[in-house]
């Protein structure tokens, strides 16, 4: 079984129910709806197709809604794209002007107060580089350092500059409410800078009466400075290497990736590595050797999930991309699972952390064939998963949304089961589920972690070694 999960972005190349089912069959664990593009109606149709494909496959495929965030962009050019020549002056203004090769407007009204002479303005993921020479009222004068062709609405970055934009734009608020009402399993917040950015999202969720995990996209230098508190405040992290590689020197990105993965593992929260993982497969049938190594190294770093963006959303063969990534992951895991970085040993912790840590040790000691977490919220499964152990990890939950959310977590395979009322019900469910599908044999030992009494979220306090086929009183050994 593949442990590292695959997040695939939907888009024009995967827009029909048949195409989405192909991605699920190829190994997609979580579908990403990127709200930087497309309408609510289009994304709703994709959402419904994912649910249909998930039900048909018998797997809990998650749906991640990725909010656009307050990305700052250029305005429009009156006569189409323009060519910026190195050495030329170019003005970016908050005024509403028809753009040309001398000047263009911007959506960021705070630009003149954010920048000072000497600051860099990197347009279109750094392909075009401008340097600020002076600020004159609403106009920011720059000199073109690296030129090129620029078109309407291109995003730009201000590396090293604290940007005065809110955590959520008006569009993000509308999109978040829509996603919650639709039934998204989790949402991702773009351009997170501090733990405080989570507060507005949680306030909207409270207002809607719907709460789902919120992932912070780490793509700003301020997020790196505040990484530990961001990990604690959010429910997971996405290492968004696209904007991160523009905002930071490229040589720093791999180390940020490793640090973010380790911080999330210590906290028991999922972490996604994203951007340009198999980008050449947008048009080719095979990845480059460097891309294969990039995927392998993210696996060896201990990531929960790897994300495909344009490779699946607008690529020429999305299912092949997912299959290729799955093959690389499986091979690396089969050869090098023991090379993952170890966790720091905790001196003090919660009962749940103690029980899940002990369960990992007990499973190895007694030769358990599976670790099983009965969970209402998914937390106990996540706490076990952070140890990245060889023993297969199964989660049993009565909550369909928890099943879909755990699709993002390393190594977790989830069974949807009726609510249990007694610990004897647990072992009966384990016997029924695993023996019927041939996942375990009579006499094998499994280690079960649960809360007693059952059905109360956040009460993981018990562990049981169960001999398969002996369900009922006395089933533990």
Predicted features and spans:
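Non-catalytic helical/linker scaffolds that mediate oligomerization, partner binding
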Residues: 1-477
């Amino acid at each position: 079984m593949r442990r590292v999960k695959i997040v695939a972005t939907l888009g024009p190349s995967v827009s029909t129910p048949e195409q989405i089912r192909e991605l699920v069959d190829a190994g997609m664990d979580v579908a990403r709806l990127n709200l930087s593009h497309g309408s609510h109606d289009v994304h709703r149709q994709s959402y419904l197709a994912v649910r249909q494909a998930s039900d048909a496959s018998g797997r809990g495929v998650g749906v991640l809604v990725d909010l656009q965030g307050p990305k700052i962009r250029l305005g429009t050019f009156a006569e189409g794209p323009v060519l910026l020549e190195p050495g030329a002056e170019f003005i970016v203004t908050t005024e509403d002007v028809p753009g040309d090769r001398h000047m263009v407007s911007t959506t960021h009204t705070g630009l003149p107060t954010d920048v000072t002479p000497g600051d860099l303005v990197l347009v279109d993921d750094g392909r075009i580089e401008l340097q600020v020479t002076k600020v004159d009222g609403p106009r920011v004068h720059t000199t073109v350092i690296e030129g090129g062709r620029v078109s309407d609405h291109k995003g730009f970055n201000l590396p090293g500059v604290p940007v005065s934009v809110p955590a959520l734009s008006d569009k993000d608020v509308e999109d978040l409410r829509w996603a919650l009402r639709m039934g998204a399993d989790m949402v991702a917040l773009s351009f997170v800078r501090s733990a405080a950015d989570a507060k507005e999202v949680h306030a909207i969720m409270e207002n809607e009466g719907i709460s789902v995990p919120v992932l912070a996209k780490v793509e700003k230098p301020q997020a790196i400075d505040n990484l530990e508190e961001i990990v604690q405040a959010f429910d997971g992290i996405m290492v968004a290497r696209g904007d991160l590689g523009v905002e930071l020197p490229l040589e720093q990105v791999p180390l940020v990736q490793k640090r973010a993965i380790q911080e999330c593992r210590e906290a028991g929260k999922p972490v996604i590595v994203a951007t340009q993982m198999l980008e050449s497969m947008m048009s080719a049938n095979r990845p480059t050797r460097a891309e294969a190594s990039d995927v392998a190294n993210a696996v060896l770093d201990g990531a929960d999930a790897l994300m495909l963006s344009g490779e699946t959303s607008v690529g020429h063969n999305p299912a092949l991309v997912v299959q290729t990534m799955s093959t690389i992951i499986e091979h690396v895991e089969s050869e090098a699972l023991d090379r993952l970085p170890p966790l720091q040993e905790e001196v003090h912790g919660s009962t749940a952390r103690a029980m899940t840590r002990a369960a990992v040790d007990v499973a190895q000691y007694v030769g358990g064939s599976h670790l099983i977490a009965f969970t209402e919220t998914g937390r106990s499964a996540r706490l076990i998963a952070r140890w990245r152990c060889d023993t297969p990890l199964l989660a049993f939950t009565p909550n369909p949304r928890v099943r879909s959310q755990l699709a993002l977590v390393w190594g977790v395979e989830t069974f949807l089961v009726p609510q249990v009322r007694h610990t004897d019900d647990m072992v009966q469910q384990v016997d029924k589920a695993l023996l019927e599908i041939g996942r375990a044999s009579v006499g094998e030992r499994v280690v079960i972690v649960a809360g007693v009494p059952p059905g109360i979220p956040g009460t993981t306090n018990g562990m049981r070694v169960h001999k398969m086929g002996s369900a009922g009183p006395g089933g533990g050994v």
